[in-house]
Amino acid sequence: GKRSLREMSETERQAVVSALRGKGFKPAAKGLEGPFAAKLQALWIAAWNLGLVRDRRDPAILAFVKRQTGIEHTRFLRDPADARKAIEALKGWMAREAKVDWRETEHMPGWQKMPGARIALAQWRILNGPPRDAAEDFLLFKDFVEQRAFSPLVRMTAREWVGIMNTLGDRIRALRR
C-alpha cells in the first residue's frame, strides 16, 4: 500500500473513497450557503436563545425560510427583497414574543445599537422580569455582562455578545424545560 494520497493515481483515490463510503463514512454536511445565510442563521440562533425556536438546526431554518419566501434553500436566496421577508419575519417575531427592541435613537449609546446587546437585554428581561428600578437593573445587567466577558460594556464586540447570549439562552431553556 501507499502511505499518502499524493502517491496514488485518481483511480486509486476513488477506490479509497468508495471503500470508506462502504464502511459508512459520509462527507461532512455543508452549512447554510448564500449571501444571506449568515444573517439568517445568526437571527435563528438568537431566537433559539430567546426560547422562541425549539430546533436550532439548519433544516428548521430552511423550513422557516421556505414558509416566508417560497424559496427552498438559502443558497437560492439571492434577491435582497426575498431575504428581507425572512429577516424581518424573524426580527418581528423576536420583537413580539420576546420584546427585542430594534428601534434606534440618536442618543442611544453605541453598545446598545449592537444586535447582540438588544437580544441580551431582552433575555435579561425574560429571566428577571420588568425592572422595578431601571437604574439598578441596568447596573445588574452591566455587572453580569462585564463579569462574563471580561470587557467593559462600552467595548463589547459582536463575538463577546454571542457568548453572553449563549449563556443567557442556556438559562432561558433551562427554565422552560
Model regions: which residues?
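Interfaces that engage single-stranded nucleic acids at replication/repair/recombination sites
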Residues: G1-R177
